[in-house]
């Protein structure tokens, strides 16, 4: 009996210590970051510990079991809400409670779920300066055209870039939700490659909803320094995340690189199986890495690559950010918006005076921050 008891104690001691985590998701009406009794709890919000995914109860509460490789508690930010870059909490020792206050944010998503978002990639600001012009272009376009969110698909770049970029573009100073992916040059020296990224930008995989679409952020498989996460980690979480969406929900995946050149998008792992993303109504795989502007239909899925908006592409494409116009079914059209052009106008083809006395003049006009609808013109009569 004593031997049995001793063996049980040894087995328990050898097992990893994991704790249950609890919390609440609520509407932070006064934006103080604290749940007040008068504030509305939110039910049905997905919450994860990086492996397990649960949904909040009617009172906004949740309980997660935790797991051996846990680092964050994070939510799937629901459509119509935003956080100030706080869709996650780092798991701290001796802390088991984690609340999430959400702020209503519905004006930029139409009633039928259609919306637009901005995609940027490969800004690589570690060795460049004077970023204000292109950042302002993105901010002003997002405001003028009511973009639902901005996504950066990685290569921010190296320690200097990682520390600086969050100050350039975040949900608060862009007045628009800003999300980040990790790229190969964002895996830097540390205990593990993503340590610095996590300390600034949070988890390397997570999801959020906008309109009728479920958006999933996934990490670059590898890079300059070995990551602490594995394809097994991502695959296990991804299966659980997808298990909580309504069948037929349109899905878009963001990553720094393209998953496959084939028509079937299968996320593979070593020990956790695989996922055929085509079976989950995958609409697009959106990425960067190649420094080109390129879109291709692979079977039923579009792969969409966007180049650098501050430097241009290695294919000599000009500087631009991409705008995705998404309809109620998750289908989309794509548009490139060229940066550094502030209300540019150029006479293209002045012609001779018509019999009626009218002088037709064709002009080329462009603005980085909005489409041009009209150009007021005044004429001065010049005598010969």
Question: For each of these PLM feature ranges, what is it?
Answer:
Residues 32:
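Acidic carboxylate motifs that coordinate Ca2+ or other divalent cations, activating on Asp/Glu
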Residues 63-71:
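Short Pro-Gly-centered beta-turn/loop motif in secreted/extracellular proteins
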Residues 380-384:
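Conserved small/polar residues in nucleotide/adenosyl-binding loops
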Residues 301-375:
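Binuclear metal-dependent phosphoesterase catalytic core
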Residues 78-83, 90, 162-247, 270-284, ...:
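Extended active-site neighborhood of metal-dependent phosphoesterases/phosphodiesterases
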Residues 22, 29, 90-164:
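N-terminal active-site segment of His-dependent metallophosphoesterases
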Residues 49, 70-92:
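A short, solvent-exposed loop/turn motif at the edges and junctions
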């Amino acid at each position: 009996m004593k031997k049995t008891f001793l063996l049980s104690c040894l087995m328990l001691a050898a097992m990893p210590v994991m704790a249950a985590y609890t919390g609440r998701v609520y509407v932070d009406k006064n934006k103080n970051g604290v749940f007040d009794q008068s504030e509305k709890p939110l039910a049905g919000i997905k919450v994860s510990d990086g492996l397990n995914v649960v949904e909040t109860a009617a009172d906004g509460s949740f309980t997660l079991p935790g797991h051996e490789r846990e680092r964050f508690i994070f939510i799937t930010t629901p459509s119509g809400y935003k956080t100030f870059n706080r869709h996650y909490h780092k798991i701290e020792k001796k802390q088991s409670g984690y609340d999430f206050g959400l702020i209503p944010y519905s004006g930029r998503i139409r009633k039928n779920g259609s919306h637009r978002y901005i995609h940027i990639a490969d800004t690589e600001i570690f060795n460049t300066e004077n970023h204000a012009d292109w950042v302002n272009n993105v901010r002003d376009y997002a405001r003028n055209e009511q973009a639902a969110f901005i996504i950066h698909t990685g290569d921010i770049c190296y320690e200097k870039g990682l520390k600086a970029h969050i100050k350039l573009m975040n949900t608060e100073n862009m007045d628009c939700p800003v999300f980040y992916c990790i790229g190969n040059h964002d895996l830097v020296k540390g205990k593990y490659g993503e340590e610095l990224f996590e300390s600034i930008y949070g988890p390397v995989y997570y999801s959020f909803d906008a309109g009728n679409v479920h958006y999933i952020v996934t990490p670059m498989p590898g890079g300059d320094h070995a990551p602490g996460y594995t394809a097994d980690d991502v695959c296990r979480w991804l299966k659980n995340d997808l298990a909580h969406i309504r069948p037929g929900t349109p899905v878009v995946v963001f990553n720094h690189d393209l998953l496959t050149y084939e028509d079937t998008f299968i996320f593979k792992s070593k020990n956790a199986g695989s996922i055929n993303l085509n079976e989950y109504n995958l609409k697009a795989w959106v990425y960067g890495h190649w420094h080109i502007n390129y879109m291709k239909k692979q079977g039923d899925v579009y792969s969409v690559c966007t180049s650098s908006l501050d430097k241009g592409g290695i294919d000599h494409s000009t500087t631009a950010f991409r705008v995705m116009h998404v309809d109620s079914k998750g289908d989309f059209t794509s548009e490139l918006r060229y940066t550094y052009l502030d209300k540019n106008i150029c006479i293209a083809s002045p012609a001779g005076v018509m019999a009626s006395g009218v002088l037709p003049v064709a002009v080329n006009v462009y603005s980085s921050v909005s489409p041009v609808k009209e150009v007021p013109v005044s004429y001065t009569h010049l005598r010969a």
